[in-house]
A protein has these predicted regions:
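Short, low-complexity, charge-dense intrinsically disordered segments
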Residues: 1-3, 7-13
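N-terminal beta1-alpha1-beta2 module of alpha/beta enzyme domains
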Residues: 14-84
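Internal, glycine-rich beta/alpha segment that forms the wall or movable "lid"
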Residues: 15, 61-65, 98-173
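Hydrophobic faces of well-ordered beta-strands that scaffold small-molecule active sites
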Residues: 20-22, 51-53, 90-92, 120-124
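Active-site beta-loop-alpha junctions enriched in small/polar residues
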Residues: 25-27, 56, 95-97, 125-129
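Acidic (Asp/Glu)-rich catalytic clusters
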Residues: 44-45, 79-86, 109, 113-119
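A structural motif corresponding to the C-terminal end of an alpha-helix
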Residues: 46, 84-88, 153, 157-161
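Structural motif corresponding to the early beta-alpha repeats
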Residues: 79-83, 89-98
Length: 173
């Protein structure tokens, strides 16, 4: 089963553009490198605009029914998809920002953007699974503030040759 999603964006001319894509199933009994590759290439050959992956790092037993094993990590999956597709945009439906460092996210997505010829999309969110946050040692109640700060830092890293940032959750020079 595939979940079709749509993204609406505006250009500088204020025209609306709808892009239709597929949320690639990167988890569960049907997920395997072979099936992911087949779905990616089929989706691209059918002319879809987007191929998106889901994110979870540590699946706890209480939600394992929703996200059964295996669960392929989305960032490394996107790097692989960049090499086996040529035109379709690739990205995350929601990358749970507080699960990774701001520097790691910025570097990984900058690399994938280069590998893919500018086809990567970073979809982000704050997350909802309290047990997953606990397992990763991230404070659940601060996930919104962490996400906001990380996104500020990531933007600086992507737009400045020599970036520096001093915040509560991330600092670099």
């Amino acid at each position: 089963d595939l979940c079709v999603s749509a993204v609406i964006s505006t250009s500088k001319s204020k025209e609306f553009v709808m892009k239709v894509g597929v949320n690639l199933i990167n988890f569960g009994p049907g997920a395997s490198p072979d099936s992911i590759k087949r779905w990616a290439q089929l989706t691209e050959s059918l002319g879809y605009h987007l191929l998106m992956t889901s994110d979870h790092i540590g699946i706890k037993p209480d939600v394992q029914g929703r996200y059964p094993a295996p669960f392929y990590e989305p960032v490394s999956t996107l790097a692989w998809l960049a090499g086996i597709t040529t035109t379709i945009e690739i990205g995350t439906t929601v990358l749970i920002v507080p699960y990774r460092s701001a520097l790691e996210i910025a570097k990984a997505f900058a690399n994938i953007d280069q590998f893919s010829g500018g086809r990567v999309i970073l979809g982000v969110g704050i997350g909802w699974a309290q047990e997953e946050f606990a397992g990763l040692g991230v404070e659940y109640k601060r996930r919104g503030a962490i996400t906001n700060e990380y996104l500020e830092a990531i933007k600086l890293l992507w737009t400045q040759d020599l970036a520096s940032y001093e915040g509560r959750y991330v600092s670099f020079k």
